[in-house]
UniProtKB/Swiss-Prot annotation:
<feature type="propeptide">
    <location>
        <begin position="24"/>
        <end position="51"/>
    </location>
</feature>
<feature type="disulfide bond">
    <location>
        <begin position="70"/>
        <end position="89"/>
    </location>
</feature>
<feature type="disulfide bond">
    <location>
        <begin position="53"/>
        <end position="92"/>
    </location>
</feature>
<dbReference type="GO" id="GO:0007218">
    <property type="term" value="P:neuropeptide signaling pathway"/>
</dbReference>
<protein>
    <recommendedName>
        <fullName>Neuropeptide ShK-like2</fullName>
    </recommendedName>
</protein>
<keyword id="KW-0165">Cleavage on pair of basic residues</keyword>
<keyword id="KW-1015">Disulfide bond</keyword>
<keyword id="KW-0732">Signal</keyword>
<feature type="disulfide bond">
    <location>
        <begin position="61"/>
        <end position="85"/>
    </location>
</feature>
<feature type="signal peptide">
    <location>
        <begin position="1"/>
        <end position="23"/>
    </location>
</feature>
<keyword id="KW-0527">Neuropeptide</keyword>
<comment type="function">
    <text>In vivo, this neuropeptide induces contraction paralysis followed by death (within 2 hours) on 4 zebrafish larvae on the 15 tested. Also induces body contraction in Nematostella 11-dpf polyps.</text>
</comment>
Length: 92
């Protein structure tokens, strides 16, 4: 009886782990798909698209914290952010 319980427990544990791994991969795929769709949607609606900009970085450049760094030359990330935004045709 104990052996049957151990085998049953092992099978259930294996099945649980397999389902958990599958669920994580489905979540990762869904997240990736959502990010790709969001990037495409934002890029298509963006006025940057009209100027030939199709990179995903303009989404990042439009965030409030990045804009604050762009407008503040004393910010520690100002040079990096300005450089990245210029390469994507986005003017902070």
């Amino acid at each position: 009886m104990t052996t049957i319980r151990c085998v049953l427990f092992a099978v259930l544990l294996f099945a649980y782990c397999a389902l958990l791994i599958k669920a994580r991969s489905i979540d990762a795929e869904a997240e990736k798909t959502w990010q790709e769709e969001e990037t495409k949607t934002v890029a298509e609606k963006s006025p940057l698209k009209k100027r030939g900009c199709s990179d995903a970085f303009p989404v990042v450049c439009r965030s409030p914290s990045v804009k604050a760094a762009c407008y503040n030359p004393n910010h520690r990330s100002h040079a990096f952010i300005t450089d990245v935004c210029k390469h994507t045709c986005h003017l902070c």
